[in-house]
């Protein structure tokens, strides 16, 4: 499989519920690099890079609601080309 990067925006009750940290754990478990960060509008932005199948697994996890404490209402995503190399999955 080829390597890909996506950027996703997750909306709903996704801040203050451990969403970024649980996403980081899941992404690292899948061998992905990238980041998760809170945005001012209450959403979370996630960039994930790695094997296509693993990125798709993370996207499915996000769309299925992420951590139990969160309530995901909507996930938008598109292909992404990061400006620099991502060597780990971080919280921003």
Curated annotation (Swiss-Prot):
Keywords: Disulfide bond, Hydrolase. Coiled coil: none annotated. Disulfide bonds join 5-49. It catalyses: an acyl phosphate + H2O = a carboxylate + phosphate + H(+). It comes from the Bacteria. The active site is at residues 20, 38. The keyword Thylakoid does not apply. The keyword Disulfide bond applies. Its EC number is 3.6.1.7. Residues 5-92 form the Acylphosphatase-like domain. One of its GO terms (molecular function) is acylphosphatase activity. Belongs to the acylphosphatase family. This is Acylphosphatase.
């Amino acid at each position: 499989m080829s390597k890909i990067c996506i950027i996703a925006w997750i909306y709903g009750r996704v801040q203050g519920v451990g969403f970024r940290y649980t996403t980081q754990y899941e992404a690292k478990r899948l061998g992905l690099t990238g980041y998760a960060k809170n945005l001012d509008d209450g959403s979370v932005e996630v960039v994930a890079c790695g094997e296509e199948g693993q990125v798709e697994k993370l996207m499915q996890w996000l769309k299925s609601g992420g951590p139990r404490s969160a309530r995901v209402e909507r996930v938008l995503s598109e292909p992404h080309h990061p400006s620099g190399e991502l060597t780990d999955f971080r919280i921003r």
